[in-house]
Design a protein with these regions (language model features):
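N-terminal leader/targeting and accessory segments in enzymes
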Residues: 1-92, 351-354, 380-381, 385-395
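Phosphate-binding loop of NTP-binding sites
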Residues: 10, 89-222, 226-234, 426, ...
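Residue-level signal for inorganic ion chemistry
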Residues: 9, 39, 58, 93, ...
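Short acidic-hydrophobic, aromatic-tinged amphipathic segments that line or gate anion-handling sites
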Residues: 81-85, 411-420
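Active-site beta-alpha connecting loops in nucleotide-dependent enzymes
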Residues: 46-49, 316, 334, 338-407, ...
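Acidic, Mg2+-coordinating active-site environments of NTP-dependent enzymes
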Residues: 68, 73-77, 183-330, 354-355, ...
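ATP-dependent carboxylate/acyl-activation modules
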Residues: 108, 317-319, 441-448, 460
Length: 460
């Protein structure tokens, strides 16, 4: 964050003229341990700690103002910014700060693939100038303002991920960020328990248009039936990408899966035909790459430079990260999971070159009433994925195991991380491959920690 006057940063939260013009803000924090002279401390009430208990101490440590939901003992009225909703305060400050700078910005949302698409878009743009992106899971009403406050006078591009669990959230994020280009990767069933239907999820994702200017490109997946039939706002310019239809603005042809990535021919009706290779597995990642390409080129970046950037893409966390360990190939994809991403991962894995295929699949969380049906469908998909052995973990994944076993798949349900790791260690051989996928809350990385440690001990 670069220095900004408190009056500009707090506009909309305080009456005009109530903040002395000479007061400067050097940072904004919600963590009392990070309070420094010149900062604004935002108090959030929490289950374990209430930030209001640290507001007075924050002023002692140099904070110029504290944002609080109510008057706090020890905090002078002239130092308190009263706001009943701390998230709203963060969003207002993020929007005010962002308005001081003019990077070319891409906003990314969608039910599946938005984080990977964000990473790919960052890779596509980074070669053209200083670029920032959303880090980790900072894609909500607390994290996105923090990302906006990382923009500086030298920032040329910004890639902002926008997540949501309820209608209206992306509208607020988009209006604060004001991207130049929007991306919607696809419409799945994540958060369907909150929104009721995929049609409503589609409407919620389209809220990104609220922050797009007149004539802005909106990059959309032509292969998604909900997006294709959606009524788009008149002020945006759709840019369609597809893996199946050559009539789309940008499509992928001759798609091939290799041992460490995907290759394909990219046909852009506006800019020509190019050969592309990405270090990411699966057709779904080809779609993510097309979305990133569309956004970067419609911002005016040269296609050749964009494609070079995509070839250097680096995945974050355990998202289809390929690890070679003692002769076994492990595809770590345990950061998140839903029915759409599970289907894509199994489709990728079925084409993965190896001796025998093993899968460790865990629960998909937050599916509400769809959970039972989704986990049974996962069992049917697993049975069609040429697996040598399926190991499941989690209460919901028991249904997956039952259905897969009934269809002839060699199946084992584990009740602990140790049991899951042992089941794999006892059965896997050099040349085999393992897909590990579940929702992040299932913590299947703990199985991998045991698995790798036991492999190492066996070698020693």
């Amino acid at each position: 964050m670069e220095k900004i006057s408190a009056s500009k940063l707090l506009a909309g939260l305080v009456p005009a003229g109530s903040i002395p013009e000479e007061v400067q803000v050097e940072s904004v924090t919600t963590d009392s341990r990070e309070v420094r002279p010149g900062c604004i401390f935002v108090a959030f009430p929490g289950e374990k700690f209430d930030g209001h208990d640290f507001a007075a101490k924050a002023l002692e440590n140099g904070a110029v103002y504290v944002v609080v939901n109510h008057p706090v003992e020890g905090v002078p009225a002239e130092k308190a910014i009263l706001c009943p909703d701390s998230y709203h305060a963060m969003m207002v400050m993020g929007a005010n700060y962002r308005s001081q700078y003019h990077p070319r910005m891409v906003g990314v949302t969608g039910s599946v693939g938005k984080t990977t698409t964000k990473q790919m878009t960052y890779a596509a743009l980074a070669g053209f100038g200083e670029t920032i992106k959303t880090e980790g899971n900072q894609n909500n009403e607390l994290g996105m303002p923090r990302t906006l406050m990382r923009i500086g006078s030298s920032t040329e591009y910004a890639v902002i991920e926008m997540g949501m669990s309820h209608a209206g959230e992306i509208d607020r994020l988009a209006r604060a960020a004001r991207p130049d280009v929007g991306i919607i990767t696809c419409i799945g069933v994540s958060h369907i328990g909150n929104l009721g239907s995929q049609e409503n999820i589609c409407k919620a994702k389209l809220e990104i248009c609220a922050g797009l200017p007149e004539g802005a490109p909106l990059v959309l997946n032509y292969d998604d039936p909900f997006l294709r039939k959606a009524k788009l706002p008149e002020h945006v310019r759709p840019v369609w990408f597809s893996l199946t239809d050559e009539n789309a603005d940008v499509c992928a042809l001759s798609i091939r899966q290799e041992t460490d990535g995907m290759s394909f021919v990219l046909e852009d009706q506006e800019k020509g035909t190019f050969v592309v290779r990405i270090p990411a597995m699966g057709r779904h990642n080809v779609a993510n790459a097309l979305a990133a390409y569309c956004a970067a080129t419609r911002l005016g970046c040269d296609p050749h430079g964009v494609i070079k950037g995509l070839s250097n893409f680096e995945q974050t966390g355990r998202r289809q990260k390929v690890v070679h360990s003692k002769g076994v190939t492990v595809i770590e994809d345990c950061y998140n999971a839903n029915p759409d991403s599970m289907k894509a991962a199994l489709a990728m894995f079925r084409e993965f070159p190896c001796k025998r295929r093993f899968a460790l699949l865990g629960d998909m969380l937050e599916l509400g009433e769809l959970s039972r049906e989704a986990h049974e469908e996962l069992g049917r998909l697993a049975a069609e994925s040429d697996l040598y052995c399926l190991v499941t973990y989690g209460e919901n994944a028991k249904r997956t195991a039952v259905v897969a076993a009934a269809k002839g798949v060699k199946t084992l349900h584990a009740d602990s991380y140790r049991e899951a790791a042992d089941a794999l260690l006892d059965r896997m051989e050099s040349g085999d491959a393992l897909l590990v996928k579940a929702s992040h809350g299932m913590a299947l990385e703990k199985v991998l920690e045991i698995f790798y440690a036991e492999q190492k001990d066996a070698e020693e």
